[in-house]
């Protein structure tokens, strides 16, 4: 069902499907993974301090108009719209990554393109709120917001 192949522009690899996938379908269970000892270009953050490496996740590219959710609680890939055979499978990297090991300039071409992809930490909450984000990212965003609000509060002497 899942296939790793060369990207259309020939610059890398991508993950595609050989069969149609219907919206809201969990189509891959993430079970054959190993804990990542450090963040890498191919690791996926699944908790506040935990990242993993997995073959298919390593080939799942970013898009600001994704067709897949990486659900780090259920450890599954789920379609967020109908996906046709041969279509590149993509997810929104800040949905799992707070701070990325290797930020990059997005070239997805979407009207929703965020430009530099460096992790959820660097995105405004109103923009992040337009996407599915995993529980650990939501928790870290709230902690970040609360910390920023505390800095704005005058200190009584």
Where would I find each of the regions flagged by the language model?
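Conserved catalytic SET/PR domain of SAM-dependent protein methyltransferases, capturing the structural core
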Residues: 1-157
């Amino acid at each position: 069902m899942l296939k790793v192949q060369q990207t259309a522009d020939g610059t890398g690899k991508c993950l595609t499907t050989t069969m149609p996938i219907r919206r809201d379908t969990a189509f891959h269970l993430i079970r054959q993974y190993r804990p990542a000892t450090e963040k890498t270009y191919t690791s996926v953050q699944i908790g506040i301090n935990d990242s993993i490496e997995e073959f298919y996740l390593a080939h799942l590219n970013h898009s600001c108009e994704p067709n897949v959710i990486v659900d780090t609680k259920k450890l599954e890939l789920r379609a967020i719209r109908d996906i046709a055979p041969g279509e590149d499978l993509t997810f929104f990297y800040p949905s799992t990554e707070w701070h990325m090991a290797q930020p990059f300039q997005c070239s997805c071409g979407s009207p929703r393109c965020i430009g530099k992809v460096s992790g959820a930490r660097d995105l405004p909450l109103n923009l992040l709120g337009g996407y599915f984000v995993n529980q650990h990212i939501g928790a870290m965003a709230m902690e970040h917001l609360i910390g920023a609000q505390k800095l704005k509060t005058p200190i009584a002497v």
